[in-house]
């Protein structure tokens, strides 16, 4: 078993489940129970839709004004959904409530949108730490703590390698960031800005991955984070990536020990 785990965003949930249970089979079944139980229905369809186009001029005008109303509403809201919805999901997935109950020490990252700094949690309320690290900006309302507004740990540290540096002898990074980009169907201001931000994030994640001793990076393509319907396929993809790398990982560990 690893001597310490660090997790950001989805990695905080997976890491906490493993650190608590040490049982990958239980984790997989727990997620299947979550999906089949309908708890994810509360999140709705969070996939980012492409550009909408109406065949009529009046439809285009109506969409023009609708988009501007949405922009005005967004300027006055912290998120589309209250973070209590994701808290319910995290509470269902985690078998323990505090860091002290974990079988492996863990560090969970969140991001303070006031300062842009990563906030590291390693004690106290485990559920709250995972909720903060999983709070997708704009989708869920951020957590308020003192003067901080805390959101997804992946914003400041998508791959929390720095959180483990100096604390362990060997860092194995599990990178589930996009491995490719789909061709843009339409070129417009929104799609170009979004694509540029995606590219920036991909390159920053690679920079963090370069700081690890070994990296396993499953080929998830351009899969959106909300594609829960692809659960079985993504599990298979992750397992195949690990199996393909396991001999190289063992050889690297042996070389360093020798």
Per-segment meaning from a language model:
Residues 1-8, 16-258:
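Patatin-like phospholipase
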């Amino acid at each position: 078993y690893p001597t310490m785990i660090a997790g950001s965003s989805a990695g905080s949930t997976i890491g906490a489940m493993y650190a608590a249970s040490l049982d990958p089979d239980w984790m997989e079944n727990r997620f299947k129970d979550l999906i089949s139980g309908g708890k994810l229905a509360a999140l709705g369809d969070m996939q980012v839709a492409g550009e909408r186009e109406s065949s009529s001029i009046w439809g285009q005008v109506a969409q023009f004004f609708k988009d501007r109303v949405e922009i005005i509403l967004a300027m006055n809201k912290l998120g589309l959904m209250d973070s209590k919805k994701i808290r319910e999901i995290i509470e269902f997935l985690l078998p323990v409530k505090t860091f002290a109950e974990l079988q492996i020490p863990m560090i969970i990252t969140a991001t303070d949108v006031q300062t842009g700094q990563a906030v590291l949690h390693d004690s106290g309320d485990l559920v709250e730490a995972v909720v903060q690290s999983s709070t997708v900006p704009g989708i869920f309302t951020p957590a308020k703590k003192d003067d901080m507004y805390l959101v997804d740990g992946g914003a400041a540290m998508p791959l929390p390698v720095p959180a483990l540096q100096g604390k362990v002898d060997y860092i194995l990074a599990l990178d589930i960031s996009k491995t490719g980009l789909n061709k843009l169907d339409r070129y417009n201001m929104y799609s170009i800005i979004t694509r540029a931000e995606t590219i920036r994030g991909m390159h920053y994640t690679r920079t963090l991955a370069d700081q690890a001793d070994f990296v396993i990076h499953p080929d998830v393509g351009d899969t959106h984070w909300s594609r829960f319907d692809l659960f079985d396929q993504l599990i298979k993809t992750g397992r195949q990536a690990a199996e393909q790398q396991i001999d190289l990982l063992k050889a690297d560990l042996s070389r360093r020990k020798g």
